[in-house]
Amino acid sequence: GTVWLNIGDCYAGYSGNTGGATGSDLRGTRNTTVVKTGSNLKKRDLVGVPWVAAFALREAGWYLRCDIVWAKPNPIPESVKNRPTRSHEFIFLLSKNPQYYYNMDAIREPLAKPVGKKVNSRGERLIVGNPKGKNSRDVWWIAPKPIRGSHIAVFPLDLPKKCILAG
């Protein structure tokens, strides 16, 4: 079997005086983790939580099979002025064994051109393209579907569905 892991990342910060700001006045403190003394992280460093977790799982015996970029066409706005707005997360495909079930046909993507015939340089006719579609790529463009009255960060159901179908 497989495990599909999605963990959000955060930025390093420091605990301490917030200048009297509270609640929603703490701009930029969302997705922030406190830096411990002696850490090699600096304030405002991207921590890399997904990769730290993936490498720790690999050290624990898991096979790190693939990193998939979940590209978000409509990400949550960020009020940052010193870096681009984050519009992706990582999904890691892991397995406990080198041989595992993976159903590539279940998540194939449509072909740009229909399956057809082509003539090669020797005049032989070849069938081009898999009629089931092309193999899934490692960048998945999946947007959440808005739900009235719901939380702003709606998790798209198509994301776990694709993982479940594949493995």
Protein language model features and the residues they cover:
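Core catalytic lobe of class I
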Residues: 1-167
